[in-house]
């Protein structure tokens, strides 16, 4: 089994979906994971997911497929923040540390593309702290980013954050792939 979460509206997500569907002996399950805005008073407001999926994609409600019980071979997800996003969150059952504990391979692919970043652009490089050093990247077995240049910056950023002795770990798990977009 391969469980894909969130929207497939972006070109690269459709490419990934089709790639997994083309693999022999692979059952692909797509779920739109519930997302919540955090309110100023500390509460949560459910986001009305208006993500449109291509007609050929069947969405399996979270109530109908429980990855905790099914233990899929791979989970592919796009939300790295867990509870570190000040504006929104998902239910903790969908946080990366839980996902990682219930699959053979956890794969993170960013839900966005950035412009290519020059490592000398300190503003852009500093901003990478907001999405690179997040739990989803750390807990994943595999991270697919848009280019070799971005891959090198992820490795550099994570190595700076976690220490020189971790560089080989990041280099082994982060790969550049065609994730589409502009």
Locate each region found by the language model.
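Active-site and donor-binding regions of nucleotide-sugar-utilizing enzymes
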Residues: 13-177
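Donor-nucleotide binding loops and adjacent catalytic segments primarily
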Residues: 182
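Single conserved hydrophobic/aromatic residue that forms the stacking wall/gate
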Residues: 1-15
């Amino acid at each position: 089994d391969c469980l894909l979460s969130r929207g497939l509206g972006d070109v690269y997500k459709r490419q990934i979906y089709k790639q997994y569907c083309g693999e022999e002996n692979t059952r692909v399950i797509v779920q739109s994971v519930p997302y919540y805005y955090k309110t100023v008073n500390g509460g949560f407001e459910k986001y009305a997911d208006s993500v449109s999926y291509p007609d050929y994609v069947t969405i399996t409600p979270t109530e109908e497929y429980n990855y905790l019980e099914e233990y899929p071979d791979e989970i592919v997800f796009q939300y790295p923040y867990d509870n570190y996003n000040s504006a929104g969150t998902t239910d903790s059952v969908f946080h990366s540390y839980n996902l990682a504990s219930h699959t053979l391979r956890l794969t993170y692919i960013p839900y966005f593309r950035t412009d290519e970043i020059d490592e000398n652009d300190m503003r852009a490089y500093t901003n990478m702290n907001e999405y690179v050093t997040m739990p989803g990247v750390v807990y994943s077995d595999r991270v697919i980013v848009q280019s070799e240049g971005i891959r090198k910056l992820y490795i550099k950023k994570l190595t700076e954050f976690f220490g020189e002795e971790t560089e080989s770990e990041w280099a082994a798990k982060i790969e550049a792939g065609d994730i589409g977009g502009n």
